């Protein structure tokens, strides 16, 4: 499919007639005549990719590290809660978020924000061009805590505790230094897998 899409990108194709080769004309038209593409599509795609890809990876590591500090029973329950969105079907996820981001006063988020006095009138989260991209990023981040998160969590929980003791003897003074000098180097394979899955 990817190869066919690349080949078709160099042709004129309307699904009725056979494709006609046009060279780079489609790309020239895309970057020179389509103002919407350069003004909205490219910046929104880059923003989405950075927040969901890079942000999701960092969030996976942070959540995995935070959970590794908890006791085994609490960690297991929290890991299931965090991982469960990746097992949930897309239709159910969309229904849940549609109720949360409902643009009326009865939408969960609007109700809470109005109750706390943060906003005075409901925001149409899913209809507003200002709020739609942030909402999409939040939903994507929430639903992307999947296999990458679990692999990083398993890597962190299996780091040899003697490495942390040796690091303290060598002069590591705080958790931040532990993360940089012990945790990250020890879970590099799991982090690579998490980056691929992000």
Model-assigned labels for residue ranges:
Residues 1-198:
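A structural signal for multi-pass alpha-helical bundles of membrane permease subunits
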């Amino acid at each position: 499919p990817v190869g066919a899409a690349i080949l078709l990108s160099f042709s004129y194709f309307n699904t009725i007639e056979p494709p006609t080769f046009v060279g780079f004309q489609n790309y020239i038209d895309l970057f020179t005549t389509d103002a919407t593409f350069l003004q909205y599509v490219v910046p929104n795609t880059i923003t989405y990719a950075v927040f969901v890809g890079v942000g999701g990876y960092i969030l996976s590591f942070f959540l995995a590290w935070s959970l590794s500090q908890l006791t085994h029973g609490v960690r297991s329950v929290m890991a299931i809660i965090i991982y469960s969105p990746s097992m949930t079907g897309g239709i159910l996820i969309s229904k849940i978020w549609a109720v949360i981001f409902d643009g009326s006063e009865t939408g969960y988020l609007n109700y809470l924000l109005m109750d706390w006095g943060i906003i005075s009138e409901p925001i149409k989260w899913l209809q507003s061009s200002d709020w739609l991209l942030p909402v999409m990023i939040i939903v994507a981040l929430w639903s992307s805590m999947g296999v990458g998160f679990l692999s990083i969590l398993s890597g962190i929980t299996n780091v040899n505790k003697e490495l942390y003791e040796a690091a303290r003897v060598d002069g590591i003074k705080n958790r931040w230094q532990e993360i940089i000098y012990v945790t990250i180097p020890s879970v590099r394979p799991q982090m690579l897998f998490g980056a691929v899955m992000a």
